[in-house]
Amino acid sequence: MTKKIKCALIGPGNIGTDLLAKLQRSAVLEPVWMVGIDPESDGLKRAREMGIKTTADGVDGLIPHMQADGVQIVFDATSAYVHAENSRKVNAQGALMIDLTPAAIGPFCVPPVNLIEHVGKGEMNVNMVTCGGQATIPMVAAVSRVQPVAYGEIIATVSSKSAGPGTRKNIDEFTRTTASAVEKVGGAKKGKAIIILNPAEPPLIMRDTVHCLLESEPDQAKITESIHAMIQEVQKYVPGYKLVNGPVFDGKRVSVFLEVEGLGDYLPKYAGNLDIMTAAAARTAEMFAEEILAGRLTLKPVHA
């Protein structure tokens, strides 16, 4: 039996429940706590049935147990409004916080683009941007590593059913955080993000459009090669990530059209937006866990 790093999840909604399913398959992570605020929530009930410890008292219900239960990594899948306080309390216990809200108080992490550089820095809070960011920023980065991108615009379309109350409350934060990460991680000089919730029935698969305006004429062969290479990187942890059309070149503009099919861990396969977020968070946590297990990373309490 290999040693696993123990984890807690805050937020038993769509994202938290999907993430729990992924963590249970991990070779290096073991989910032991699920934290919510509503004792009747489906997510808490489901976690209890799986034998996971639960609390409906929010993060304050978890803190007293973290040391005894050896929790070293905590995932926050609640809302941007409460994340800073959650993170402060968790960091004070010496645990790493992986933020799946658009709060973005820690540095952005998009695994195929910049995960490696984060792991060596010993950060105590990393932010997973947004589902739209995880799906599209690798494409912006694939273009910007070939030649400068003056402007990057991403449009993420997700099914209404896959957007729970937390996601809906965070729409403004979603657009701000994603646009910021299109610049900081994607490498665009200016970024813009748009999210569309589509109420169609049956629910539509996640679709993403990425437009990059270049400073000079595009090197079509190099950009095409870079995009295909990046798609293979993303597919390592989200197999349902695929290029539907593109790259399409129109003057200095490059456009890429994507679809993201989920694994169907919690919501059906149309909810690729959950998968790309939770798979990226699990991938990030696994990298940190491997460093901890190898003795290369020691987490220390952070007192605000």
From Swiss-Prot:
EC number: 1.2.1.10
Domain of life: Bacteria
Keyword Protein biosynthesis: no
Catalytic activity: acetaldehyde + NAD(+) + CoA = acetyl-CoA + NADH + H(+)
Alphabetical list of SUPFAM superfamilies matching this protein: Glyceraldehyde-3-phosphate dehydrogenase-like, C-terminal domain, NAD(P)-binding Rossmann-fold domains
One annotated GO molecular function: acetaldehyde dehydrogenase (acetylating) activity
Catalytic site: 131 (acyl-thioester intermediate)
InterPro entries referenced in this protein's UniProt entry, alphabetically: Acetaldehyde_dehydrogenase (IPR003361), Acetylaldehyde_DH_C (IPR015426), NAD(P)-bd_dom_sf (IPR036291), Semialdehyde_DH_NAD-bd (IPR000534)
Coiled coil: none
Keywords: Aromatic hydrocarbons catabolism, NAD, Oxidoreductase, Plasmid
Gene Ontology biological-process entries: catabolic process
Chain positions recorded as NAD(+) binding sites: 162-170, 273
Group of enzyme by EC: oxidoreductase
Family to which this protein belongs: Belongs to the acetaldehyde dehydrogenase family.
Name of the protein this chain belongs to: Acetaldehyde dehydrogenase
Naturally occurring in which organism (per UniProt): Polaromonas naphthalenivorans (strain CJ2)
